[in-house]
């Protein structure tokens, strides 16, 4: 489960989760340092309780730009996945089902801004949201709750089979006749 979290972090943020200031300051990576920095003493670069391994401006530009763009629920899941507890105790790690549920919810929050036409995220429970591109205010939408999913309702929103407790192609759009 841990390697899945690392791969997902790289895909979303274009950076490795433990490569921050500590790795940048390392003159020569030895086997011992690698075990320390990426193993039992690893520190997540966005750990809210430990800023000793923050991304380095000019070096870790992607994660600096992208952290805060994705919804907080995804960031919270990465914080949980790379916490000291998850590193030391495998039973505390985020399992694949939790990742899948979160990413399905994430897809439901992706929308086109009604002002600039660029894609942005609309979080169903937040007030005072802005477009990540043009930074104009987005009205809080009505929300459709299906099981654990909270789907913001906006023009063009799709409900997929995966949102419903039915079998079939999970990417198929639900059609109502």
Located regions from the model:
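Conserved C-lobe activation region of Hanks-type protein kinase-like domains
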Residues: 1-2, 7-75
């Amino acid at each position: 489960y841990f390697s899945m979290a690392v791969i997902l972090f790289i895909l979303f943020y274009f950076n490795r989760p433990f490569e921050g200031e500590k790795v940048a300051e390392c003159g020569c990576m030895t086997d011992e340092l690698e075990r320390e920095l990426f193993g039992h003493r690893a520190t997540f670069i966005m750990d809210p309780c430990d800023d000793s391994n923050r991304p380095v401006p000019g070096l870790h530009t992607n994660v600096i730009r992208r952290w805060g763009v994705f919804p907080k629920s995804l960031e919270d899941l990465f914080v949980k996945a790379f916490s000291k507890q998850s590193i030391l105790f495998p039973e505390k790690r985020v399992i694949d089902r939790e990742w899948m549920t979160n990413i399905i919810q994430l897809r439901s929050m992706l929308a086109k801004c009604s002002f600039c036409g660029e894609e942005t995220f609309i979080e169903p429970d937040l007030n005072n949201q802005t477009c990540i591109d043009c930074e104009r205010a987005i009205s809080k939408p009505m929300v459709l709750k299906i099981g654990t999913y909270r789907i913001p309702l906006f023009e063009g929103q799709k409900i997929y089979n995966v949102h419903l407790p039915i079998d079939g192609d999970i990417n198929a759009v639900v059609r109502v006749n």
